[in-house]
């Protein structure tokens, strides 16, 4: 939150080939500056039928996210296993990107804005170089998430670190999460233990008052420093990766990605790849349902739908970037003899239909390493993979990369001298719709044993609509006065208060029930 009014202008680009059509749209919103970055390329190279899509949510600055968007896909294409074992290549690229940032500051040359070079060097302290310089250690409190999708032939790989997310829609609008937020409060117990054993401590529940309600966050901090992060895996953030007594994979923050790979079948409709700015406001099932319903309308344009989804992130107070990838009907019915160089690609994307909340299901498509699949209470199936592989970014000219109005050429081929288009974001995690964080010491339920935050569904008040007039949250976002508020739902309710004498009592009761939580911040 750094602006008196949100920056609602959007960067939007679309492209298609005979198999897929995609639209990418990004918006700064209430963020003080743009820290999201993205990369989208329909044809990554001439030799293989490979497409690449990546969203990078920066924090502590935009530089790391921009670097990922410019360089990730190039590192991938240059890897020796790119053609024969794409899974292994992706895994190594995640780690090599982290190493590149830590070895020297040469990477910053790719992300220096050409029209603001003097200010950058002043900020970096170049003018003070007569004094001996300390050994370079990498960006201490600058980092980025990464959520990427690589499509080759009739197969796809999803790899990620952090809390940017990829969601698949199967026929009928069934939402399936293909990535899982890397946060100590929502991942496995081992994730939290790793952070604690490396010297991290939890601030517990940090509250920020917003219009009479409260936002509750959990943040990890170093035991001896004031800096903190809200994710447990990232690229960069080397202040959290410098414990000399621990191996790389045991540091407080790591860069080991989770990977999921599977065949693309004809019942798959589209993918949504987005930064935390979107998922802070709406859950996976709501996003997929909205897009599915809009696509069913005759004459609906994918570009317009993507921009509408980006606007949902306005209430988060963060930057929002969304890549919407639509599979064309019948385009993925063929089967390759060789799995297109995916190597030991392993996966299992859950296939559920009308399954009861909390039930688990698995499909017979593919095989997945150390994975499990469950359906969450919001109705979206989740498939959780073990730790395997990484990913890249898109290409374009350096000028286009640092210019928010630049264009990503979807059919650009990878050139070692080229780079990708980008924008930038601060991914602070927040609860999803319908959830309230009560304490960081209470278990969620049977499926979340070991989590030290409790999430419960509000029983009386539906968090997706106004508790006074009953208007839905999506319609409230269309009201200019409400959409510009930090909390659109509460702002709308305050308007209703002037029209309903009983509203004040209802708001008071709601506040008491929600206690110290407002998931719409």
UniProtKB/Swiss-Prot annotation:
- Which stretches does the entry tag as region Disordered? 354-431
Supply the name of the protein: Probable protein phosphatase 2C 16
Q: Which cofactors, by name?
A: Mg(2+); Mn(2+)
Q: Which organism is it from?
A: Oryza sativa subsp. japonica
Q: Which UniProt keywords apply?
A: Hydrolase, Magnesium, Manganese, Metal-binding, Protein phosphatase
Q: What is its EC number?
A: 3.1.3.16
Q: Which family does it belong to?
A: Belongs to the PP2C family.
EC main group: hydrolase
């Amino acid at each position: 939150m750094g602006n008196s009014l949100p920056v609602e202008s959007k960067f939007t680009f679309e492209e298609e080939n005979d198999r897929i059509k995609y639209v990418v749209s990004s918006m700064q919103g209430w963020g003080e500056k743009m820290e999201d970055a993205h990369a989208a390329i329909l044809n990554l190279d001439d030799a293989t039928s490979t497409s690449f899509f990546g969203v990078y949510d920066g924090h502590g600055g935009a530089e790391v996210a921009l670097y990922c968007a410019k360089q990730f896909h190039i590192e991938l294409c240059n890897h020796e296993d790119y053609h024969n074992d794409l899974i292994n290549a992706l895994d190594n690229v995640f780690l090599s990107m982290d190493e590149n940032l830590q070895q020297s500051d040469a990477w910053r040359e790719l992300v220096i804005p050409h029209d603001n070079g003097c200010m950058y060097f002043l900020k970096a302290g170049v003018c003070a170089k007569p004094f001996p310089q300390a050994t370079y250690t990498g960006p201490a409190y600058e980092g980025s998430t990464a959520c990427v999708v690589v499509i080759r032939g009739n197969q796809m790989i999803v790899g990620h670190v952090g809390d940017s997310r990829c969601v698949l829609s199967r026929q009928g609008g069934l939402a399936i999460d293909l990535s899982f937020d890397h946060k100590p409060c929502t991942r496995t117990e081992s994730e939290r233990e790793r952070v604690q054993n490396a010297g991290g401590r939890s601030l517990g529940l940090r509250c920020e008052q917003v219009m009479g309600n409260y936002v509750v966050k959990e943040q990890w901090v170093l035991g001896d420093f004031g800096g903190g992060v809200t994710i447990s895996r990232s690229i960069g953030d080397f202040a959290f990766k410098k414990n000399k007594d621990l191996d790389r994979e045991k540091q407080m923050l790591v860069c080991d990605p989770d990977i999921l790979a599977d065949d693309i079948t004809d019942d798959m409709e589209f993918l949504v790849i987005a930064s935390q700015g979107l998922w802070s406001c709406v859950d996976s099932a709501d996003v997929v349902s909205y897009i599915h319903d809009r696509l069913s309308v005759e004459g609906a344009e994918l570009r317009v739908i993507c921009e509408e989804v980006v606007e949902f992130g306005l209430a988060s107070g963060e930057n929002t970037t969304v890549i919407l990838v639509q599979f064309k009907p019948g385009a993925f019915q063929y089967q390759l003899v060789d799995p297109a160089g995916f190597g030991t690609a392993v996966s299992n994307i859950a296939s559920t239909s009308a399954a009861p909340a909390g039930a688990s299901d698995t499909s017979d498509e593919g095989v997945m390493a150390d994975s499990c699949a469950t359906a969450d209470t919001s109705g979206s199936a989740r498939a959780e993979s073990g730790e395997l592989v990484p990913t890249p970014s898109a290409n374009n000219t350096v000028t286009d990369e640092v210019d928010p109005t630049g264009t990503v050429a979807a059919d650009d081929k990878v050139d070692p001298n080229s780079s990708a288009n980008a924008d930038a974001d601060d991914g602070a995690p927040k609860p999803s719709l319908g959830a309230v964080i009560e304490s960081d010491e209470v278990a969620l339920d049977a499926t979340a044993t070991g989590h030290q935050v409790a999430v419960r569904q509000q029983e009386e008040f539906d968090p997706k609509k106004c508790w006074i007039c009953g208007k839905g949250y999506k319609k409230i976002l269309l009201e200019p006065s409400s959409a510009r508020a930090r909390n659109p739902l509460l702002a709308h309710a305050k308007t209703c208060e002037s029209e309903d004498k009983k509203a004040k009592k209802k708001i008071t009761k709601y506040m008491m029930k929600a206690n110290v939580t407002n998931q719409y911040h």
